């Protein structure tokens, strides 16, 4: 989907994420970012791979979420780099990936709830259909660039 490997975000989003990282670090975790800013061309490619509006924003509806540079897909890892147990793997396009958590192990649900609590405290809102997806509550203008 991407022609680059680095994660790009708005400066204000990065500042909020740094506060969240400090909170997680105090609990023994680091943030692992899977996805961040997404150029519009990449959004179009992703839609071709998964044309399901529950999981991928339809590019015909304009620039949304990842295209604005204020949304991240993330998880937590321990200090030695092991991913913390969460409800599903990344980009699991099933109902188990939503924020209901009634159909996943309690440890995974507790970890996801803890991550959501910290991210909310730091100015993010989670997408209901994906436990890993967080958007900055600050609204940003659309931007489209190829890193």
Language-model features and meaning:
Residues 1-147:
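Cell-envelope/glycan interface and biosynthesis
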């Amino acid at each position: 989907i991407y022609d680059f490997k680095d994660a790009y975000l708005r400066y204000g989003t990065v500042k909020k994420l740094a506060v969240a990282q400090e909170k997680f670090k105090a609990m023994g975790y680091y943030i692992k970012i899977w996805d961040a800013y997404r150029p519009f061309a990449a959004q179009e490619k992703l839609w071709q791979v998964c044309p399901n509006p529950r999981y991928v924003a339809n590019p015909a509806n304009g620039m949304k979420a990842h295209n604005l540079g204020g949304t991240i897909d993330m998880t937590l890892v321990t200090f030695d780099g092991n991913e913390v147990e969460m409800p599903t793997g990344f980009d699991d396009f099933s109902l188990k990936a939503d924020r209901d958590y009634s159909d996943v192990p309690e440890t995974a649900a507790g970890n996801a709830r803890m991550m959501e609590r910290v991210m909310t405290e730091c100015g993010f809102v989670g997408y209901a259909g994906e436990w890993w997806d967080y958007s900055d509550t600050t609204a940003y203008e659309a931007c489209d660039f190829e890193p």
